[in-house]
Structure formats: structure tokens, C-alpha cells
Amino acid sequence: MQKLQISVYIYLFMLIVAGPVDLNEKSEQKENVEKEGLCNACLWRENTTSSRLEAIKIQILSKLRLETAPNISKDAIRQLLPKAPPLLELIDQFDVQGDASSDGSLEDDDYHARTETVITMPTESDLLTQVEGKPKCCFFKFSSKIQYNKLVKAQLWIYLRPVKTPTTVFAQILRLIKPMKDGTRYTGIRSLKLDMNPGTGIWQSIDVKTVLQNWLKQPESNLGIEIKALDENGRDLAVTFPEPGEDGLTPFLEVKVTDTPKRSRRDFGLDCDEHSTESRCCRYPLTVDFEAFGWDWIIAPKRYKANYCSGECEFVFLQKYPHTHLVHQANPRGSAGPCCTPTKMSPINMLYFNGEGQIIYGKIPAMVVDRCGCS
């Protein structure tokens, strides 16, 4: 009993020496720690945003198989960009497309862009073939995007200059061939009879899928084509070599190739905004502005929402694979902690100039973060 009393006295003496406990001070310390944690989280997200933007620039160039961004000036773009229906329709698609709502479906995308449409502008022929002493129009080079995909559609687009009176126009598309014994240097592809009314000029499309298929099978037979569109007075209305004021009216090929559908699976995660205090793994908004990059070679979109993942991962929170938690429980020292990463990515459609001056409309996979999780 005496020993117990001595112990109590010693305990009371220690409390007196230690002094009173200030509960408000502890509360302030806790609040300061929480504020410091929030500031660190904001700084972390800011650094993550910057890193994500740089990674996106590298990804886009890599997925488009470009070593560097094409060096195309705004003036050159104005001259090269066709003012034609198919291209205007593609650009209009970007104007009306909103951010698609995520339904939890996760595509198994390939790494590189899967091309849907290629708009090919004419180039100078390496063979320097001439017809009647004049440079021919037009010669088209085809990239691997066309050569190694299944061809769905190939349209040649030509622009006919306006007429002052109602006129019947006879259009001919000729394929250049090696000179024959009788001197023949071309064979017909298509002939058209068009009725034009006074006013503005018109775009006319011609199906050249069969010709393109033959060229792809036998590249040496591709010597180019000749375009003629004569009115009743013998005046050629086809714009083959644009004159001043005819920028964007050069003939071009619109080629469509197949795109293989992919499987999908389900996934879910948290969504946050830039003001969120959520510490767990979460998806945050991030807008990529190509004009801010100085990337004028991207025609559309000029910007898009890419998003990024940030936050802490506990072993019981949003793990991508169910066995991750079990592995850690079995061997906590031998397994690294889970990381906050994208678990669902979706593609973006892009209209752009490649390094050869061709206009490409393609789908670039895994460019938008739709879901985040721990794995």
C-alpha cells in the first residue's frame, strides 16, 4: 500500500513539472500540418500538370511517327489547305464535338495512330514526265498509312472555275502511262459531262479507287494523271496550277482506310477539380492548347481536354487488380506500394499536316485520361 502511494506522488510531481496541457495549441499544430499537407498537394499537382503537358507533346510526335514537329508556317498552311467539302466537313466535326461522356468502357488501344482519312496533295514527279511539253498534273505520293491499310474509298477532287453563262463542261481524267509504239502516253480513267450555272466555281469528286489500288500493287505504274475540263469554247476550267487568288483550290486525293474495332472492359474511379482537397488517387482536369505550343501544323482540334492522375494510394483503395492487396498482405516488405495511374484512356481524332505536307485525319489512341486508379 505504501509503495502504491509513493508511485502516485511521483506521477503527480511529474505532471506539475511538465506544466498544463494547452489543447488549443495542439489544435493549431494539427491545423498547420493539414494546411502544409494541402500546400504540398497543390505543388505536387502543379508539377504533375507541367510534366503531363511535356509528356503529351512527346507522345503525340512519337505516335504520329514524327521525330520533330513539322515546320509549316501559317502562310504555307493557308496555301496548302484545300477549301473543299471533305476537309470542311472534317473541321466542322471538331466544332460540334463535345467531350464525350465516359461510360466506364476501356478500349484496348494500340500505340500508334490508326488513320481513317488521308488527304494527299500533288507533288512533283521524280520521273519528270511531261505531256505536250508542259508539266503534268498531278502526281501523288502515297505514305505507308495508305500502302499498308485496307482501302475503303479514294476520291479525286478538282475545282472548276466559275462561268459567266450556263455552260456544259466535259471533264476527263487521264492516267499517264509509258509511251507506246503509236505514241500514246495516257489512258482514260473517267469522263464526265457537267452542266454549270453562272456564279461561283464548284468542287467535283471522281471515284479513283480502282486506279489507286493498281498503283499500290504496282508502284512503278504510277506516273501521274492529267486533268482536263473544257467548256463549249475549249477553255479549260480545271484548276491544276493555281493562279493568284486561287489558294486552296489545288486538286487532291481523299483516301479512307479501315480502322479495326477493339475490345472493351469496365473500370471506375474518382473525379476531382483543381480546387479539390481530395488526397486519394483522383482524375484532375488538364487542357492541352496546341496554339500555345506553337504547333500550327495541327489543323484541328486547336485544344482538347487530356486530364491527369494524382493522389495517394493505400493498399485497399481503388486497386486495378484485386490480387494486389493480397500480395501486399502476404509480403508487405517485398512489394512496392501502388501508384495512381490512368486505368482508362480514350483516343482523340486529329487533323494535321505530316512531314511530307500531306493532310492526315487520324485517331491517336490513349491521349485522354478517363479514369484513374491504383495499381
From Swiss-Prot:
Prosequence residues removed at maturation: 19-266
**PTM per UniProt?**
Synthesized as large precursor molecule that undergoes proteolytic cleavage to generate an N-terminal propeptide and a disulfide linked C-terminal dimer, which is the biologically active molecule. The circulating form consists of a latent complex of the C-terminal dimer and other proteins, including its propeptide, which maintain the C-terminal dimer in a latent, inactive state. Ligand activation requires additional cleavage of the prodomain by a tolloid-like metalloproteinase.
**Which Gene3D superfamilies does the entry mention?**
2.60.120.970, Cystine-knot cytokines
Record protein name field: Growth/differentiation factor 8
Signal peptide bounds: 1-18
Q: Which residues cross the membrane?
A: none
PANTHER family on file: GROWTH_DIFFERENTIATION FACTOR 8, TGF-BETA FAMILY
User: How does this protein assemble?
Assistant: Homodimer; disulfide-linked. Interacts with WFIKKN2, leading to inhibit its activity. Interacts with FSTL3.
Q: Does the keyword Amino-acid biosynthesis apply?
A: no
GO molecular function, a single term: cytokine activity
Q: Where in the cell is it found?
A: Secreted
- GO BP field: myoblast migration involved in skeletal muscle regeneration; positive regulation of lamellipodium assembly; positive regulation of macrophage chemotaxis
Annotated glycan sites:
N47, N71
| Family named by the database record | Belongs to the TGF-beta family.
What the protein does? Answer: Acts specifically as a negative regulator of skeletal muscle growth.
Kindly state one GO CC term assigned in the UniProt record: extracellular space
Q: List the disulfide bonds.
A: C272-C282, C281-C340, C309-C372, C313-C374
Provide the alphabetized UniProt keywords.
Cleavage on pair of basic residues, Cytokine, Disulfide bond, Glycoprotein, Growth factor, Heparin-binding, Secreted, Signal
User: Is Secreted a UniProt keyword of this protein?
Assistant: yes
